[in-house]
Amino acid sequence: MSELKMSLSPHIHGGDCIKRNTYGVIFALVPAMLMAVFSYGLNAIYLGCYSLASCLLAEWLITRYLMRRPCSLADGTAVITAFVMALCLPVRTPFWTVVLGAFGAIGLGKLVYGGVGRNSVNPAIVGVCVTLLCPGSLVLSPGMGYGVKSPYLFALAMILGLGFMLWKRIITWHIPISIIVTTIVLAGVTAVADPAYADPFNLVLGGGTLLGAVFMATDYTTSPMSRPGKIFYGIAIAAIAVMLRTHGEERNAMLIAIFAMNILTPIVDRIFKPRRYGKA
């Protein structure tokens, strides 16, 4: 009789589970992408198409010719990376910058670790970091998914996406809700202390808070496994982001916060270990 082996979650039993979740996230991103098109017109379509084509091409070229293994395009993760990265970028980002960011996201953010489920940092964040290093980068311009033009409509699009993923049990509430609530509380405290700081609700509606909380911080591979760990992770992301914003880093505060906590996720998992089955 073979030995029974037990390990921590997540337990993925087949490719269908991964595809179901990734395609569910893609569907949840559709309202945000449509809102970007509504707000920015053809420029949003161009940016989305550049990002999508570049990410798909990067995945195909790297897996086929560098890694010498079957292409993994069917899992849908490259599409998620493309859409999230497009929402993080300014709408007038040059084509060549988007291409470099896409190759950085797929190559350095995912495939260099071995592929899906092995990366330690959200690939879309890696892609945005690559674009920020490019000459002439629009560092001070907000991403088209930051809700600058239509904050309430963008917030509605993000909430629709969040509601769908919660309904389908693609994600749990622990990370997004802890980020949103902590941001409101901490930003409210700073606004009371100094009225010059942004209103907490405006901070949540704009500045990429909802985009990061719903579609970036909730990435399975780069977030903690236990429920207490997820809540701590969300609180820490919000605290770092609010602190950075109070010191003048408006646009990239959420990206930096998620990036930092992605790196610290293994430590969070060690601190908040799930109780063993049968143990008090």
PLM region spans:
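Cytosolic-side transmembrane-helix boundaries in multi-pass membrane proteins
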Residues: M1-Y23, P224, L244-A280
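Structural signature of hydrophobic alpha-helical transmembrane segments
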Residues: G41-S54, R92-G101, Y146-L156, Y197-T209
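Hydrophobic, membrane-inserted alpha-helices
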Residues: A28-M35, E59, A78-A86, A102-G109, ...
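C-terminal ends of transmembrane helices
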Residues: S9, L57-R69, I106-G117, L160-I170, ...
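Conserved mixed alpha/beta catalytic, RNA-binding, or beta-rich assembly cores of soluble enzyme
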Residues: M165-A196
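Long hydrophobic alpha-helical segments that form multi-pass transmembrane helix bundles
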Residues: G117-L160
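N-terminal signal-anchor module of multipass membrane proteins
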Residues: M1-L56, W60, Y277-G278
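Loop-to-transmembrane alpha-helix initiation sites
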Residues: S120-I125, P200-T209, K230-F232, G248-F259
